[in-house]
C-alpha cells in the first residue's frame, strides 16, 4: 500500500480511484493531480514508481488543502457562522438543515431520531 499524506492508498485500484481515498480529493481533482504529475490515470497504484509517487505528493502539497488542514478549515468556517449569529450559524447550532430545505416532513438526518409526543386522552362520553 502506498502512503500519501498519511493515508493508505489501495494498490489494486487505478490511480484515478485510489486518490479519492484522501479526504478532499474527488474524481475530478484526482484526474487533475495525475495529469499535473504526468502519470497515466489508468495505471494501477502498485505499478507506480517512487518518483511518480513523490511527484503526486508534491502536486497535492502545493495545490490542494486535504485531510486535517481541510477539516480544520471547515470547522473554523462553521464556528465563524455560529459566532456571528447569522441564520446559517443558528441552524448549525440547532442541528437543522442549513440550506433552506423544508423540515415539516423530512430532514431526519439532521434532526435525528423521532421524538414522539403522546396525544391527550379523550374524555369518556356519558
UniProtKB/Swiss-Prot annotation:
GO biological process: translation
GO molecular function: rRNA binding; structural constituent of ribosome; tRNA binding
One Pfam family this sequence matches: Ribosomal_S13
Region (Disordered): 98-126
Keyword line: Ribonucleoprotein, Ribosomal protein, RNA-binding, rRNA-binding, tRNA-binding
PROSITE patterns, A to Z: RIBOSOMAL_S13_1, RIBOSOMAL_S13_2
NCBIfam families, A to Z: uS13_bact
Family, per entry: Belongs to the universal ribosomal protein uS13 family.
Record function comment: Located at the top of the head of the 30S subunit, it contacts several helices of the 16S rRNA. In the 70S ribosome it contacts the 23S rRNA (bridge B1a) and protein L5 of the 50S subunit (bridge B1b), connecting the 2 subunits; these bridges are implicated in subunit movement. Contacts the tRNAs in the A and P-sites.
Protein name: Small ribosomal subunit protein uS13
Organism encoding this protein: Amoebophilus asiaticus (strain 5a2)
This protein's encoding gene: rpsM
Amino acid at each position: 500500500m502506498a502512503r500519501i499524506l498519511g493515508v493508505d492508498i489501495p494498490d489494486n485500484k487505478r490511480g484515478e480511484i485510489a486518490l479519492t481515498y484522501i479526504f478532499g480529493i474527488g474524481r475530478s481533482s484526482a484526474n487533475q493531480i495525475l495529469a499535473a504529475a504526468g502519470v497515466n490515470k489508468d495505471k494501477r497504484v502498485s505499478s507506480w514508481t517512487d518518483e511518480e509517487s513523490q511527484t503526486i505528493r508534491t502536486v497535492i502539497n502545493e495545490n490542494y488543502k486535504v485531510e486535517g488542514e481541510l477539516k480544520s478549515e471547515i470547522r473554523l468556517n462553521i464556528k465563524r457562522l455560529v459566532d456571528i449569529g447569522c441564520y446559517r450559524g443558528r441552524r448549525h447550532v440547532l442541528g437543522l438543515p442549513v440550506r433552506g430545505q423544508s423540515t415539516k416532513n423530512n430532514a431526519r438526518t439532521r434532526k435525528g431520531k423521532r421524538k414522539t409526543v403522546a396525544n391527550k386522552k379523550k374524555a369518556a362520553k356519558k
